[in-house]
Amino acid sequence: MDIEFAFEKQVIKTLSDLGIPIVLITRKNRPIYSECENPISIGVDMFGREQYLERRTAYQWQKMRENAGADGVLLEAVSGFRSFDYQRKLIERKLAAGLSVDEIICVSAPPGYSEHHTGRALDISTPECPPVTEEFELTSAFLWLRQRGKDFGFQMTYPKDNQFGVIYEPWHWMYYDNVA
């Protein structure tokens, strides 16, 4: 059986098990993301947890972080690679807490649809604000990322009113292999 097809079957079954209608996802044009193989450590995040990224992304993250630091801006990792199972458990916890499927999928991607699976997505913060809040857009770190992130291949995926129906996430950046 084709690996890609098997993964898609796993995604559909998991969505069904979680009570997430596939139409809610496909209507938002969310692509399926397979897991990164062999993500590498980028050290610990701001909470002391080991974080991982895809190899080239990790290299560009370190380079970007060093350049920001040289400009007096501190970029901190909050969350990098997340496995399919991690994302499933995240959704299960939110369902158990009483959140509706609609509420959850505007904030958290269902398993199989998270950019974090690729090892190329990174939630970024700075000591200037609490992590994963819209307040991040008011920081020097966000301003620096808006001006310089593309120099290292990073782009914010979920701007205001994005096509995927995801809340505005100024902290969520994805590496696209478009730098020399």
Feature map (PLM): residue ranges:
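Extracytoplasmic cell-surface/polysaccharide-interacting catalytic and binding patches
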Residues: M1-G80, F84-A180
